[in-house]
Swiss-Prot record:
Has an N-terminal beta-trefoil domain and a C-terminal pore-forming domain. The trefoil domain has barrel and cap subdomains; the cap has 3 carbohydrate-binding modules while the barrel is involved in host cell receptor binding. At neutral pH the carbohydrate-binding modules are accessible on the toxin surface but the barrel subdomain is not. The crystal is very stable at neutral pH, upon ingestion by larvae the crystals dissolve in the alkaline midgut. Belongs to the toxin_10 family. GO terms for molecular function: toxin activity. Disulfide bonds join 31-47. This is Binary larvicide subunit BinA. One of its GO terms (biological process) is sporulation resulting in formation of a cellular spore. It comes from Lysinibacillus sphaericus (Bacillus sphaericus). It comes from the Bacteria. Residues 1-155 are annotated as: Beta-trefoil domain. It is found in: Spore, Perispore. Keywords: Disulfide bond, Sporulation, Toxin, Virulence. Its main location: other.
């Protein structure tokens, strides 16, 4: 769970809900003032609903947190002068930093995206109830901004599957053995992802209570492309595919706000941009270096058997499969998101001592942009 290790806050809040108090030793918590709406004011007051008082702090790569309410999943969002509760979009004004003041207290700070030097803290407008949260630049020696966490509800984080060795290349057992359609699958990596960043038919409010963290599993295997018995000295043209279908690319983007770049690296949207470092580290993937998305491409390639005896050849390409799971392990995307990477291909052969076929002309015949 590498992405959780990136927190530089002194308060380990990623594994529990906390009841956030407005300032040290206050009896009045933060709560969502209009819990039935997707957005609303964040107030310091006596709350009528318990869930409105509890928040989970989702950590990001750089140590900041996204503060989500247990009742409906809405998050702290900065506006011109105050902080409200709104739907998570990945806006810079939805990322806060916990800054330690004493062993028991801290304050929440937000960076003004228009100014690198403008750091503001959250402060109740007044000590009269109810009171909205406003920004203040008065940070030094200001006790009104101090917060303490109380009445914690511990979460059970999903158990991530153990990583496995990379998939082994299939081995042919005879001249008539075409090999398996797929090799055995290997789990390469997996990572936690907050429920506010994924798409599921379960309501966001229900997700916050039952599966606040999902996980994404990255699996690899060898996918068969073709198989043929090559007579001695024969040449054959074979059709091969690479990339990802447009349907899978769109579904993956909708499901986890992540897509696959043309270089097979991952491209992160606004919602997941803050966890891209931990995500790629955990799943053993890379961040894309291109703005172009991966497409599905069909090739024809010529192969020649240079041996003076018949050889069975079966061509394989490495497949990377991504699946989204709830905390109980239930898979959300019933059809996995699969990318075929033709930078990694192999040809199984029988007899085993035969040489690989000689590669001739390669021609792109279709891609999903045409």
């Amino acid at each position: 769970m590498r992405n959780l290790d990136f927190i530089d806050s002194f308060i380990p809040t990623e594994g529990k809900y906390i009841r956030v108090m407005d300032f040290y030793n206050s009896e009045y918590p933060f709560c969502i003032h209009a819990p039935s709406a997707p957005n609303g004011d964040i107030m310091t007051e006596i709350c009528s609903r318990e869930n409105n008082q509890y928040f989970i702090f989702f950590p990001t790569d750089d140590g900041r947190v996204i503060i989500a309410n247990r009742h409906n999943g809405s998050v702290f969002t900065g506006e011109a002068t105050s902080v409200v509760s709104d739907i998570y979009t990945g806006s810079p004004l939805q990322f806060f930093r916990e800054v330690k003041r004493t062993m028991a207290t801290y304050y929440l700070a937000i960076q003004n995206p228009e100014s690198a030097t403008d750091v503001r803290a959250l402060e109740p407008h007044s000590h009269e109830l109810p009171s909205r949260l406003y920004y203040t630049n008065n940070i030094e020696n200001n006790s009104n901004i101090l917060i303490s966490n109380k009445e914690q509800i511990y979460l059970t984080l999903p158990s991530l599957p153990e990583n496995e060795q990379y998939p082994k290349t299939p081995v042919l057992s005879g001249i008539d053995d075409i090999g398996p359609n797929q090799s055995e699958k290997s789990i390469i990596g997996s990572t936690l992802i907050p429920c506010i960043m994924v798409s599921d038919f379960i309501s966001l409010g229900e997700r916050m209570k039952t599966t606040p963290y999902y996980y994404v599993k990255h699996t690899q295997y060898w996918q068969s492309m073709w198989s043929a018995l090559f007579p001695p000295g024969s040449k054959e043209t074979k059709t091969e595919k690479s990339g990802i279908t447009d349907t899978s690319q769109i579904s993956m983007t909708d499901g986890i706000n992540v897509s696959i770049g043309a270089d097979f690296g991952l491209r992160f949207g606004n919602k997941t941009f803050g966890i891209k470092g931990g995500f790629t580290y955990d799943t053993k993937t890379q961040i894309t270096n291109t703005s172009q998305l991966l497409i599905e491409t069909t090739y024809t390639r010529e192969y020649t058997n240079t041996e003076n005896f018949p050889v069975r050849y079966t061509g394989y390409v490495l497949a990377s499969e991504f699946t989204l799971h709830r905390s109980d392990g239930t898979q959300v995307n019933t059809i996995p998101w699969v990318a075929l990477n033709d930078n990694y291909t192999t040809i199984a052969r029988y007899p085993h001592f035969a040489s690989e076929p000689l590669l001739g002309n390669t021609k792109i015949i279709t891609d999903d942009q045409n």
